[in-house]
């Protein structure tokens, strides 16, 4: 009898230890997500950080706005008029996320879950003439909106929750190990579950890295979008041309000064032969 009791007690202890170990493993591998938007000097830009095991694995800074068309009744209550709701991602939003080796996700909720933005990032490898090349991109976007939310929707004909999404985007393409940066506005079209409606997502002041972050809370080297590179070239080109023009002017003045000095030191030969007798 004592042996059975001891065996049962031993089994219970083992189960308790296994449960404790399982909980500890879940806690260690748990990912925490932080909304650091209050640190941004731009009131329209949000900052989100996903950390795993105490290390940053996803960072995202951006300003987001959604242009959502919806129908309202005309004054005759017969015809329909399409209005547009402009919904901005606000500070203080609730955020979730997870990091993976080839897939990472960021999910943001605001206005009491009336709006949800889900962004899926994918890392892929491609064969090129230079060999295998890895890149990451924004692969999917889901935007859930509730037309019963009265701040942005004024007397809509249909009150419902809709999903606007875009699959296989391949947007924000960036070499692996780098962050993506773009100050210019970028638009992404999302097909809505509200028939014949297209939601426009506008991103700006973007700086994102969903993979391969080396230093905690620090972006890796930036991969700038083509629009930013063009604007940077347009800003620096006049400066470069001005420097070249200034250098040409300085060189011209130096050559003129040297030439003038050399000609001034040469003996002047008189053209009038009567003056030769005064020479010597």
UniProtKB/Swiss-Prot annotation:
Gene3D superfamilies: 2.40.160.110
Signal peptide interval: 1-29
Keywords: Cell membrane, Cell projection, Cytoplasmic vesicle, Endosome, Glycoprotein, Membrane, Signal, Synapse, Transmembrane, Transmembrane helix
Source organism, top-level taxon: Eukaryota
Gene null: resulting phenotype: Gross morphology and brain structure are normal. Behavioral assays of locomotory activity, exploratory behavior and motor coordination are also normal. However, some subtle behavioral defects are observed: anxiety levels are decreased and animals also show mild defects in odor discrimination. Electrophysiological assays of striatopallidal synapses indicate defects in short-term synaptic plasticity.
One family name in Pfam for this protein: Lamp2-like_luminal
Membrane topology listed for this record: Single-pass type I membrane protein
Residues that span the membrane, as ranges: 236-256
Cytoplasmic side: 257-280
Gene Ontology biological-process entries: presynaptic modulation of chemical synaptic transmission
GO cellular component, one term: early endosome membrane
UniProt PTM: Glycosylated.
Tissue expression pattern: In brain, strongly expressed in the globus pallidus/ventral pallidum complex, the substantia nigra pars reticulata and the entopeduncular nucleus (at protein level). Expressed in the external plexiform layer of the olfactory bulb (at protein level). May be weakly expressed in neocortex and striatum (at protein level). Highly expressed in brain; not detected in other tissues tested. Detected in the cingulate cortex, cortical plate and caudate putamen. In neocortex, specifically expressed in neurons of layers II/III and V.
Extracellular side: 30-235
Effect of residue 276 to A: Cell surface localization
Glycosylation site residues: 35, 53, 102, 127
Subcellular location: Cytoplasmic vesicle membrane; Cell membrane; Cell projection, Dendrite; Cytoplasmic vesicle, Secretory vesicle, Synaptic vesicle membrane
InterPro entries reported for this sequence: Lamp2-like_luminal (IPR048528), Lysosome-assoc_membr_glycop (IPR002000)
Role description: Plays a role in short-term synaptic plasticity in a subset of GABAergic neurons in the brain.
Family: Belongs to the LAMP family.
Full protein name: Lysosome-associated membrane glycoprotein 5
Source lineage: Eukaryota, Metazoa, Chordata, Craniata, Vertebrata
């Amino acid at each position: 009898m004592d042996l059975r009791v001891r065996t049962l007690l031993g089994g219970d202890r083992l189960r308790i230890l296994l449960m404790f170990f399982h909980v500890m493993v879940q806690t260690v591998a748990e990912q925490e997500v932080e909304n650091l938007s209050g640190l941004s000097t731009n009131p329209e830009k949000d900052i989100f950080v996903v950390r795993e095991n105490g290390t940053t694995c996803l960072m995202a800074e951006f300003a987001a706005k959604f242009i959502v068309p919806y129908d309202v009744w005309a004054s005759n209550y017969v015809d329909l008029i399409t209005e547009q709701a402009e919904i901005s991602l606000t500070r203080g939003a609730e955020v979730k996320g997870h990091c993976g080796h080839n897939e990472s996700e960021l999910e943001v909720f605001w206005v009491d879950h009336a709006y949800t933005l889900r962004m899926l990032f994918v890392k892929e490898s491609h064969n090129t003439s230079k060999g295998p090349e890895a890149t990451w991109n924004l692969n999917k976007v889901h935007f859930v909106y509730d037309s019963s939310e009265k701040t942005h929707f004024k007397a809509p004909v249909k009150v419902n929750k809709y999903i606007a999404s875009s699959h296989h985007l391949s947007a924000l393409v960036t070499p692996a190990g780098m962050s993506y940066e773009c100050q210019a506005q970028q638009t992404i079209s999302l097909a809505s579950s509200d028939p014949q409606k297209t939601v426009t997502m506008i991103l700006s002041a973007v700086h994102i890295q969903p993979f391969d972050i080396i230093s905690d809370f620090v972006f890796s080297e930036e991969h700038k979008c083509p629009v930013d590179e063009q604007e940077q070239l347009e800003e620096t080109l006049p400066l470069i041309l001005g420097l070249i023009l200034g250098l040409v002017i300085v060189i011209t003045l130096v050559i003129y000064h040297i030439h003038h000095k050399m000609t001034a030191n040469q003996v002047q030969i008189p053209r009038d032969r009567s003056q030769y007798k005064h020479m010597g």
